[in-house]
Regions:
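Conserved catalytic/acceptor-binding region of the Class I
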Residues: 193, 214-303
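C-terminal lobe and adjacent flexible extensions of AdoMet/dcAdoMet transferase-like proteins
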Residues: 269-356
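Class I SAM-dependent methyltransferase Rossmann-like catalytic core
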Residues: 45-120
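A short beta-strand submotif of the Rossmann-like class I SAM-dependent methyltransferase core
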Residues: 188-191
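Class I SAM-dependent methyltransferase SAM/SAH-binding core
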Residues: 119-176, 200
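A short glycine-rich, Lys/Arg-flanked "PGG" loop and its adjoining helix->strand segment in the class I
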Residues: 199-214
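A short acidic, Gly/Pro-enriched loop at the edge of an enzyme's catalytic core
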Residues: 176-185
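Fungal intrinsically disordered, low-complexity serine/threonine- and proline-rich regulatory regions
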Residues: 1-49, 355
Length: 356
């Protein structure tokens, strides 16, 4: 379905129901663009001619802050995020939770792209901002006939990976050293608050896609706070997100709005997607335990924002504790859902690109 600014009754929103089932709800409040191995080691440098030395550079720096290891997003930016084992475990737990809920590690027409991959004509996937590499390794296991590359500024990926999976360290703020039109699928997840210019990441991804390739985005755009089934956000939740948003902006980073994303993607092909709502701490059947795991994960995410809110926003530790506790209180007494935006763009076949 192509993008349109006009709300439509045909737009779909995907809900993960408290009983674990999936249901499509029709709504007029969502726009069309949000419809809803053998021993192997990780590679850190590729010596082939098409790669450049920028692979080992990165825009941010690692620091010790209180009892956490923080990666500052930019040298002149005070925002950052933890990269220690606690945060790595949180990210991987969120991946596994979403994989169980959605049934696959992806959301979108991935099989349409990968079904023609063969030994003589292997498809290629790029995972930008791969983090712990859990998504890339999962996809490599699931599609052994496809080559998967993960790239990030932080070296926290595993050493033992499937034979068709490789990881590289690179500066995401600069052009990646890949030829134009060299990937069939590019995946970007939870990167909108971890880079200085998310739209520029998207623009670069589109140039790296082959014609008929697929760009997959899975994010929480516009700092969308947890909501009730009726799209109501409790005051404690909203106060925390307002604080985080202000701190993010004060840190020298631009808050990426959904309309900015759509504007960047509009020329790349038809934009489709879903708004996925996941129950937090409530539900029946299999969702009883899964939603509780989601609640624990969300509490860990709240703590991961402490650095940005205190150092970037100028709040005190005590103020952060008050705000975060109000957030948690609302999570525990209200039936809320986390809002995830899943968007995908299929690049047209007849696209001409100029070499850089």
């Amino acid at each position: 379905m192509p993008y349109s600014d006009t709300p439509t009754k045909q737009t779909q929103r995907l809900f993960l129901q408290p009983d674990g089932s999936k249901a499509l709800r029709r709504t007029e409040s969502i726009r069309k663009y949000v419809m809803s191995p053998s021993p192997i080691s990780k590679s850190s440098i590729d010596t082939s001619p098409e790669f450049s030395s920028t692979f080992m550079s990165r825009s941010g720096t690692e620091i010790r802050w209180k009892d956490r290891t923080i990666y500052r997003i930019g040298r002149n930016v005070t925002a950052g995020y933890p990269i220690d084992l606690i945060e790595q475990e949180r990210q991987e737990a969120e991946h596994h939770l979403l994989r169980i809920l959605l049934g696959y590690p992806y959301h979108g027409p991935v099989l349409d792209i990968l079904k023609s991959s063969s030994r003589m004509n292997r498809k290629r996937i790029l995972d930008m901002g791969t983090g712990t590499g859990i998504w890339a390794t999962d996809m490599a296991d699931l599609f052994p006939h496809v080559d998967v590359i993960g790239t990030d500024e932080v070296d926290i990926q595993p050493e033992l990976v499937p034979p068709n999976c490789e990881f590289y360290i690179s500066d995401l703020t600069k052009p990646l050293p890949y030829p134009l039109s060299s990937f069939d699928i590019i995946h970007i997840r939870f990167l909108s608050t971890r880079v200085q210019s998310y739209p520029s990441i998207l623009s670069q991804a589109l140039t790296l896609l082959r014609p008929n390739g697929l760009l997959l985005l899975f994010e929480n755009f516009t700092f969308s706070p947890p909501q009730t089934v009726h799209d109501i956000t409790p005051k404690g939740v909203q106060a925390f997100y307002d604080c985080y948003k202000r701190s993010f902006s004060s840190s020298g980073l631009k808050v990426c709005k959904l309309e900015d994303v759509v504007g960047t993607l509009r020329g790349g092909g038809d934009i489709k997607g879903d708004l996925i709502k996941v129950p937090i701490g409530h539900g029946t059947g299999r969702m009883t335990q899964l939603s509780k795991i989601h609640l624990i994960n969300l509490k860990a995410w709240i703590e991961s924002t402490r650095y940005t809110i205190i150092e970037g926003g100028g709040y005190t530790n005590n103020e952060f504790d008050i705000l975060s506790q109000a957030f948690i209180d609302d999570l525990e007494k209200e039936e809320l859902y986390t809002c995830y935006h899943s968007l995908w763009v299929k690049k047209p076949t007849n696209v001409s690109q100029n070499s850089e």
